[in-house]
């Protein structure tokens, strides 16, 4: 694929997720922090129902599979360990039509392995990213889109290299969906990435943290404007069951969720499917209102099964859901 133009080049860590289904637990609210905690009995043996292992996941691998199923020519830049888990990840990517040309096998390292405590329809993830030596690949032809998401804490020089590449190739459009460690690095550290982004995705809580209003109540219109003022051309902010919002400097749009056909099984990957579908829609020539109408459909489908990729839709199936949408499933202009 090196001499062919890639539509969608995803960059980010690949992981194996082990879903541990637990039932002997409860959720309690931390009144001071306003957060919720998963509580299990301390110092005891806790029974679990079963374990389901899912390979080749993580924000960017999920996005690459999503884009591939929607019909884009897709590749993934990532590292795997020198182990059977890494080999299985490669097999999954190939089965999904994602080019593995830029996947590096790191000698002496393990493949990232996460443990997912799966309780009811939510998950708490125990994460560990290997400190791989990151390097940007030699691309003979610039891709149409780069999709950047979760990388480990030691990846700051890598982010700088990605920023330099996008600066040198202004025809390349960058989507940035920050992962946990990228959020921790903060705006100032990753200012170049924010300012070079064509598309930026986060949720309401993350947006408030980025703009320095973490503990304040804000109108969504103001939050959209402040987030876009950081540099991205198009900002998309999700708000859980309330839906999602987008702003391109001129028009603000609100989109409700696509109704679930049955209660969600597992919410892992809902954000990845949303962001990658929105990006893919733009890459396929769709407008912003059309893109924000596509995205929740794939998220709805993903949460109906275990893992972040099982429910990802083909373009044909997504458009079938769209044609059968409820009357009120329409983007609404809010400015």
Language model: regions and residue ranges:
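Glycine-rich phosphate/adenosyl-contacting loop at the front of the ribokinase-like
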Residues: 1-75, 87, 332-335
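Conserved phosphate-binding/catalytic region of the ribokinase-like
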Residues: 1-9, 28, 214-335
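Structural alpha-helical scaffold elements that stabilize or flank donor/cofactor-binding regions
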Residues: 8, 138-140, 190-193
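Structural detector of well-ordered beta-strand residues that form the stable sheet scaffold
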Residues: 9, 75, 147, 174-175, ...
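Active-site metal-binding loops of divalent metal-dependent hydrolases
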Residues: 13-14, 151, 273
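A glycine-rich helix N-cap at a beta->alpha junction
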Residues: 92-109
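Conserved phosphate/ATP/ADP-binding segment of small-molecule kinases
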Residues: 163, 168-173, 180-254
